[in-house]
């Protein structure tokens, strides 16, 4: 089974967590694209979706699925999204696709967070994948200096502007053993919008696509 086939298996497995008649929270990325394809097969059974990115919104609308603004609703039964890395306690690094802020907002609203990944995303210690930090453009260099004081090596993701109009710093060289603590530390730096650590709001269920099928954790 190829990596993309494992992603597809995880994406389709998430369908069983979709509650008929509700609005579904939808994340961003290649694995989520498979979930959107699956969701389209039951589009008449759901009320619609809330999306964490422009790209996912366009894909959902392409299937005729109604996409709501998050401000129009007060609850989400489920949010389905991928991860760039996830550890054994379901702390995650997300934001490789630069949608981390909207992803974190939608995840906060949802009753249940379903993380869909292939088996290359599981790690013992977070940090091999660079940690994205979304920053206000004028604060980029200040935030970078503060991150260096914490032991990280921030690299500006040049040419990338988030859906919110901000910049991304990818922080390398950190073995993250206290994800909750670092999430708070980074968010406390003035000029930071948010960072890609999902530790305070981690996944409730993890669906892992493997060569032998989907594992649920």
From Swiss-Prot:
InterPro entries: NagB/RpiA_transferase-like, Ribose5P_isomerase_typA_subgr, Ribose5P_isomerase_type_A. It comes from the Bacteria. Pathway: Carbohydrate degradation; pentose phosphate pathway; D-ribose 5-phosphate from D-ribulose 5-phosphate (non-oxidative stage): step 1/1. Its EC number is 5.3.1.6. CDD domains: RPI_A (cd01398). Catalyzes the reversible conversion of ribose-5-phosphate to ribulose 5-phosphate. Belongs to the ribose 5-phosphate isomerase family. Disulfide bonds: none annotated. GO terms for cellular component: cytosol. Substrate binds at residues 28-31, 81-84, 94-97, 121. GO terms for biological process: D-ribose metabolic process; pentose-phosphate shunt, non-oxidative branch. Homodimer. One of its GO terms (molecular function) is ribose-5-phosphate isomerase activity. The lineage of its organism: Bacteria, Pseudomonadati, Pseudomonadota, Gammaproteobacteria, Aeromonadales. It comes from Aeromonas hydrophila subsp. hydrophila (strain ATCC 7966 / DSM 30187 / BCRC 13018 / CCUG 14551 / JCM 1027 / KCTC 2358 / NCIMB 9240 / NCTC 8049). HAMAP family: Rib_5P_isom_A. The active site is at residue 103. It catalyses: aldehydo-D-ribose 5-phosphate = D-ribulose 5-phosphate. Keywords: Isomerase. PANTHER family: RIBOSE-5-PHOSPHATE ISOMERASE (PTHR11934:SF0). This is Ribose-5-phosphate isomerase A. It is an enzyme of class 5 (isomerase).
